[in-house]
Amino acid sequence: MLDIRLFRNEPDTVKSKIELRGDDPKVVDEILELDEQRRKLISATEEMKARRNKVSEEIALKKRNKENADDVIAEMRTLGDDIKEKDSQLNEIDNKMTGILCRIPNLISDDVPQGESDEDNVEVKKWGTPREFSFEPKAHWDIVEELKMADFDRAAKVSGARFVYLTNEGAQLERALMNYMITKHTTQHGYTEMMVPQLVNADTMYGTGQLPKFEEDLFKVEKEGLYTIPTAEVPLTNFYRNEIIQPGVLPEKFTGQSACFRSEAGSAGRDTRGLIRLHQFDKVEMVRFEQPEDSWNALEEMTTNAEAILEELGLPYRRVILCTGDIGFSASKTYDLEVWLPSYNDYKEISSCSNCTDFQARRANIRFKRDKAAKPELAHTLNGSGLAVGRTFAAIVENYQNEDGTVTIPEALVPFMGGKTQISKPVK
């Protein structure tokens, strides 16, 4: 959520930033009009309360002097009714303002390129060279079924489209990837490992910006009023919701693996085969809490943490800056890492790393103190995929496939695969 003072002090800047995202800047005028009404109501209410205090003193004085106080008692009742009415009006305006403010996205950093879609994202780095095959490479969805690593048909029978059973060495590879990523982040990158709740309440979803605007993208357990998480970013960021982080704690770095659940509303017909776009998938997440002056350097570091996984696995990738028309709701700046997939003959997103500045912290009331005597300030929050496990799985299967139908296991994963160096079709 944005600071109301930005609307008051820099309305033109806020309008231009909102317009860059393709949203209607008139919302700024709506907020300012409501803010003016609110301030007038507060002023009028304060005057009434001051008058009520004075009338209360007059009543007490008249009673002490045994004088008739009916007129001032009547005024007191009228003032009480008027104050209740003003408070009700103020509450209504506050709700309207909050309802609008919570749907306005974060302000985009000045160095984010302008554009309308992912076609306008800007490549800033490329690592590795896509492999030239001496044979016709297969898509991962064909490879995993031939090697009995996955079963899409039975998953469709049990759950519907966009689900998968990972079987045999497919399940082992998925587990190995998660263990490898978590181990890398905790032992080399300085993150604290967390196991997170995968059902969360509405306040939690509000804190990170999924609610109220993106409810259609979520799965909800209606009876309990809980939501399945779309990413571990949600519970990890809300760890400090409504708390003041004590001096000396920041920077705080969390990592955690979870299942992620997404309805994929609006993605009908896109990536309908394989592991790229599922309703349920595994992901290792990184979340950081930083002092404001440190968050931009933290974004660079967190992105290199994700890149280190791809490089150690030997997977060609590129880094792009998301343009103004493609960046997420809560982010001020986002880097996407895209891995090379031979089946697409293109790069596909495998990680998003974002600086959300104080946007989520204001929604979730996450503050910190620089020292014991200091006034609490809003922290900056960052999040990044480290990495999307299913897409990493797909990238390994496609990039490490062999002409005889086997898949070579990247060297970094061999210890996590029980020493296994190759995946072959099971005998049975």
Curated annotation (Swiss-Prot):
UniProt subcellular location: Cytoplasm
InterPro entries for this protein: aa-tRNA-synt_IIb, aa-tRNA-synth_II, aa-tRNA-synth_II/BPL/LPL, Ser-tRNA-ligase_type_1, Ser-tRNA-synth_1_N, SerRS_1_N_sf, SerRS_core, tRNA-bd_arm
GO terms under cellular component: cytoplasm
Residue numbers binding ATP: 262-264, 349-352
Pfam families assigned to the protein according to its UniProt record, in alphabetical order: Seryl_tRNA_N (PF02403), tRNA-synt_2b (PF00587)
Keyword annotations from UniProtKB, A to Z: Aminoacyl-tRNA synthetase, ATP-binding, Cytoplasm, Ligase, Nucleotide-binding, Protein biosynthesis
Main location: cytoplasm
Pathway membership: Aminoacyl-tRNA biosynthesis; selenocysteinyl-tRNA(Sec) biosynthesis; L-seryl-tRNA(Sec) from L-serine and tRNA(Sec): step 1/1
GO molecular function, one term: catalytic activity, acting on a protein
Cystine bridges: none
Domain of life: Bacteria
Assigned EC number: 6.1.1.11
Coiled-coil boundaries: none
Keyword Hydrolase among UniProt keywords: no
SUPFAM superfamilies recorded: Class II aaRS and biotin synthetases, tRNA-binding arm
Catalytic reaction list: tRNA(Ser) + L-serine + ATP = L-seryl-tRNA(Ser) + AMP + diphosphate + H(+); tRNA(Sec) + L-serine + ATP = L-seryl-tRNA(Sec) + AMP + diphosphate + H(+)
GO biological process terms, semicolon-separated: selenocysteine biosynthetic process; seryl-tRNA aminoacylation
Enzyme type, top EC level: ligase
Role of this protein: Catalyzes the attachment of serine to tRNA(Ser). Is also probably able to aminoacylate tRNA(Sec) with serine, to form the misacylated tRNA L-seryl-tRNA(Sec), which will be further converted into selenocysteinyl-tRNA(Sec).
HAMAP family: Ser_tRNA_synth_type1
Free-text comment on this protein's domains from its UniProt entry: Consists of two distinct domains, a catalytic core and a N-terminal extension that is involved in tRNA binding.
Descriptive protein name: Serine--tRNA ligase
Originating organism: Staphylococcus aureus (strain NCTC 8325 / PS 47)
